């Protein structure tokens, strides 16, 4: 919202999303090598400290009236660099906290519920706060909220991770992880679909400020409602997944997720009703969660422990094609209009679902080291 307020340009909105995510795309694989070498809990703790400092900087510059588009882009880039460290370490930490592969799918689903509950409540509260007092208050509250996260992490006690006996050059270890992922049919299949959804499956969130103000004539509160609808859909998907799904069925869930998300985008592009848009935003959020959460579970259940950080970094990298998609979607929206841009993205998601569906029934058939179809 702040980017659109400062510039009035959908392309700038896409640039902000690009700046906040592109460091994840570039740096996450290398941080994944680091995650496999050191204590993931300590990495997550330090990442929260850095994130708190970044949010505080956003608040200071916004309150002082010195915020500009270049400065906002720079701080978003810093946020992306922090996320590149935090996300692979967090995925490895989730597995350590679970302690048992048998309950891993439920743990990942519950983690998704927590995350998406925040996405559901946060944007609505944020929209109201922005409308009442401006974005600086939101940034300040975000910075303060990290104190609770740090307190919770300080209370976590885990046995030190087993140190690897052989440590090669980081580039060699990264190459080995890519070869391992490509040679493993199940991992390869999942890591093929995730980047596509990461690229085009979140078009609705990229263009949410544009839809909120220009299509529906709303303000920050309208934006908050749209993003909360996305969070509600993701939350519903997480709750459904937490009820228990067999590993064999997770691949089909991924295909259904791409189909549901793509359909939501396509329907939204064909209508101008805010009420219907909220439903479509919910469907798109649900679809994205039904792709990403089961993909996470499939990978965590199949990867060898000594390669977990690197493979999950590749997963994070696939998710983080979002910034590239943000840039392309922003440019596409300026050229052909936001509705056409969203329709194209929906079509790509539906095509991805159809392609993945053919292989999904055999994706887990070979067990932990599944064989190709």
Q: Model-flagged regions — what are they?
A:
Residues 69-80, 106-164, 204, 221-222, ...:
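Hydrophobic alpha-helical transmembrane segments
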Residues 16, 26-30, 37, 43, ...:
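C-terminal transmembrane bundle of multi-pass solute transporters/carriers
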Residues 96-104, 301-308:
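Paired intracellular helix-loop junctions of major facilitator superfamily
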Residues 1-22:
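Extracellular/periplasmic helix-loop-helix junction of adjacent transmembrane segments
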């Amino acid at each position: 919202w702040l980017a659109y307020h400062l510039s009035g340009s959908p392309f700038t909105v896409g640039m902000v999303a690009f700046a906040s995510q592109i460091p994840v795309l570039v740096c996450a694989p290398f941080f994944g090598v680091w995650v496999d070498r050191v204590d993931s809990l300590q990495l997550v703790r330090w990442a929260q400290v850095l994130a708190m400092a970044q949010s505080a900087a956003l608040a200071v510059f916004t309150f002082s009236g010195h915020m500009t588009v270049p400065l906002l882009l720079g701080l978003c880039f810093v946020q992306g660099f922090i996320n590149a460290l935090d996300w692979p370490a967090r995925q490895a930490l989730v597995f350590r906290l679970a302690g048992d592969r048998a309950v891993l799918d439920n743990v990942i689903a519950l983690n998704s519920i927590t995350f998406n509950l925040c996405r559901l409540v946060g944007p609505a509260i944020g929209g109201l706060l922005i409308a009442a007092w401006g974005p600086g208050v939101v940034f300040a509250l975000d910075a303060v909220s990290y104190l609770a996260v740090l307190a919770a992490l300080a209370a976590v006690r885990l046995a030190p991770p087993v140190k690897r006996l052989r440590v090669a050059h980081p580039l060699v270890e990264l190459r080995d992880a890519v070869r391992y992922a490509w040679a493993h049919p199940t991992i390869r299949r999942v890591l093929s679909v995730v980047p596509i959804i990461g690229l085009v499956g979140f078009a609705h969130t990229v263009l949410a400020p544009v839809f909120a103000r220009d299509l529906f004539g709303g303000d920050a509160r309208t934006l908050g409602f749209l993003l909360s609808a996305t969070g509600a859909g993701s939350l519903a998907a997480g709750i459904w997944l937490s009820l228990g799904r067999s590993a064999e069925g997770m691949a089909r869930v991924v295909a259904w997720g791409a189909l549901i998300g793509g359909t939501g985008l396509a329907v939204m592009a064909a209508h101008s009703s805010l009420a219907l848009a909220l439903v479509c935003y919910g469907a798109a959020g649900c679809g994205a969660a039904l792709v990403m959460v089961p993909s996470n579970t499939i990978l965590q259940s199949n990867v060898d422990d000594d390669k977990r950080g690197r493979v999950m970094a590749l997963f994070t990298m696939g998710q983080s094609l979002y910034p590239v998609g943000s840039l392309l979607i922003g440019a596409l929206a300026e050229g052909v209009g936001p509705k056409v841009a969203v329709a194209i993205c929906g079509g790509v998601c539906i095509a991805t679902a159809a392609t993945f569906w053919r292989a999904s029934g055999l994706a887990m058939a070979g067990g932990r080291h599944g064989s190709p179809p």
